[in-house]
């Protein structure tokens, strides 16, 4: 990294704008499930587009380091083409995976599509694998990581129709860097319950073990995790946390502890509240530090952490989206800089006015120590677009910290970029003590207060401080 991370702590940045590019605006189309990867040449973003009365089309966008982009569409006759993941090579090329799902007459069949592409989006090699003739669908969810031998581990979400009900079927694959399929295994029976969705994967440091997260383990829709060996045999299974229905991890503190993001439910009166939380977790799923990045209200728009991108061994970008307070149609994309002890050192909101913005993913870091994000915006007139942002540490501004102490549990919620606005903080029905502070990236507090309230909201007019 050319730029020292000292800049994160010594610069007060309140209203700097990030670089951004709108890629395309399909008036009658909907963008879905983009994944991507960083390479030496730039960023690959892959996904799919649904247009009215048309097949699903796979898309690859390549963005170079200056923000210039190329777009290529992949459509295979009578197949819905769903590109869902990519992993980069040192030479600037990338391996892209996706599903080709039959949309014509006759028996349905699903094919795993594997391509190696270059920055000009030329297809260097292409492979098509029918990994299981019983599959009805290869979904738009895939996680790719390198193992210790340099091969590529692919966790792929597939599915079958069972009595008109779609059931998720998790598959594990191993590929070489030319896209040859070396090994594949359905791990559904090993896990014991069908109908799961894969929600995350990470390689365990200094081993060829795989840590896989999936819903549906043990008890219906609750979330679980399992360790797999290099032959995709299940070693250990864990029920990670009741009430959590998303899980993602990509930051190992050491060989035994990692940072994971979750969305978890909490019953508050007649509502289910969805909190976005970071945890420090060990390999046996004991929980340590906790950081609530978004304290949800009763909105029907669910907040979510989409990506954790390591900056170095001590710091990470944590990116996701959250609803605007008390709204079920408007949401913002948010990026935080967080250290391994779960302290927040900066935050940035990316939003279009009066639109539903959600983050599809992010990659990094750039030569300046920054991060590339790609998101989807749906305007109130139903126009949809994909946008790409480039952030560097100087783009990050003030943050509002709310520390809640209730029923012997202490959690810290962070509200980014509160300058010149009133922050409304929902207070739970449970009585709690709150301390509120605002600081800059050098750690200087501007404001501090303690509150003891019950069953209402706190309002802080940041512009008057």
Where are each of the predicted segments found?
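C-terminal outer-membrane/trafficking sorting elements
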Residues: 406-415, 419-465
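Residues in and immediately flanking transmembrane alpha helices
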Residues: 15-16, 77, 430, 453
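Residue-level signal for pocket-adjacent positions within structured domains
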Residues: 11, 124, 182, 288, ...
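Detector for intrinsically disordered, low-structure N-terminal pre-sequences
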Residues: 5, 11-13, 96, 203, ...
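A sequence-level/structural motif corresponding to short, flexible coil/turn segments enriched
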Residues: 19-403
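Compositionally biased non-globular segments, especially hydrophobic aliphatic-rich helices
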Residues: 10, 16, 217-219, 422
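Bacterial Sec-dependent N-terminal signal peptides
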Residues: 1-21, 402, 417, 444
């Amino acid at each position: 990294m050319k730029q020292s991370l000292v800049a994160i702590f010594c610069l007060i940045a309140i209203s700097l704008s990030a670089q951004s590019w709108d890629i395309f605006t399909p008036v009658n189309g909907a963008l879905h499930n983009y994944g991507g990867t960083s390479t030496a040449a730039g960023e690959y973003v892959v996904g799919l587009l649904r247009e009215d009365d048309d097949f699903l089309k796979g898309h690859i966008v390549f963005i170079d380091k200056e923000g210039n982009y190329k777009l290529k569409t992949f459509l295979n006759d009578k197949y819905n083409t769903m590109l869902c993941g990519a992993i980069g090579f040192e030479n600037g090329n990338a391996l892209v995976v996706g599903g080709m799902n039959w949309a014509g007459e006759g028996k349905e069949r699903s094919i795993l599509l594997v391509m190696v592409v270059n920055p000009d989006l030329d297809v260097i090699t292409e492979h098509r694998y029918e990994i299981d003739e019983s599959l009805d669908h290869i979904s738009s969810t895939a996680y790719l990581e390198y193992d210790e031998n340099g091969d590529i581990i692919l966790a792929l979400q597939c599915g079958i129709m069972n009595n008109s009900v779609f059931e998720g079927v998790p598959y594990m694959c191993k590929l070489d860097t030319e896209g040859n399929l070396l090994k594949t295994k359905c791990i559904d029976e090993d896990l014991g319950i069908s109908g799961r969705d894969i929600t995350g994967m990470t390689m365990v440091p200094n081993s060829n073990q795989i840590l896989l997260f999936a819903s549906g383990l043990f008890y219906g829709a609750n979330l679980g995790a399992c360790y797999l060996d290099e032959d995709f045999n299940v070693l250990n299974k864990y029920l990670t946390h009741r009430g959590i229905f998303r899980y993602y991890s990509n930051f190992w503190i050491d060989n035994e502890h990692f940072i994971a993001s979750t969305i978890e439910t909490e019953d508050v009166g007649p509502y289910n509240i969805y909190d976005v939380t970071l945890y420090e977790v060990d390999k046996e799923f004991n929980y340590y530090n906790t950081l609530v990045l978004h304290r949800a209200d009763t909105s029907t728009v669910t907040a979510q952490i989409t990506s954790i991108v390591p900056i170095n061994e001590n710091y990470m970008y944590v990116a996701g989206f959250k609803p605007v307070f008390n709204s079920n149609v408007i949401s913002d994309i948010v990026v935080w800089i967080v250290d391994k002890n779960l302290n927040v050192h900066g935050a940035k909101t990316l939003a279009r006015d009066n639109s539903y913005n959600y983050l599809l993913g992010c990659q990094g870091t750039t030569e300046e120590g920054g991060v590339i994000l790609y998101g989807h915006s749906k305007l109130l007139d139903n126009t949809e677009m994909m946008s790409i942002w480039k952030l560097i540490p100087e783009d990050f501004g003030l943050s509002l910290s709310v520390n809640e102490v209730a029923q012997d549990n202490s959690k810290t919620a962070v509200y980014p970029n509160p300058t010149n606005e009133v922050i409304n903080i929902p207070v739970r029905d449970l009585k709690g003590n709150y301390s509120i502070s605002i600081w800059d990236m050098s750690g200087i507090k501007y404001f501090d207060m303690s509150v003891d309230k019950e069953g209402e909201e706190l309002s802080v007019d940041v512009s008057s401080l």
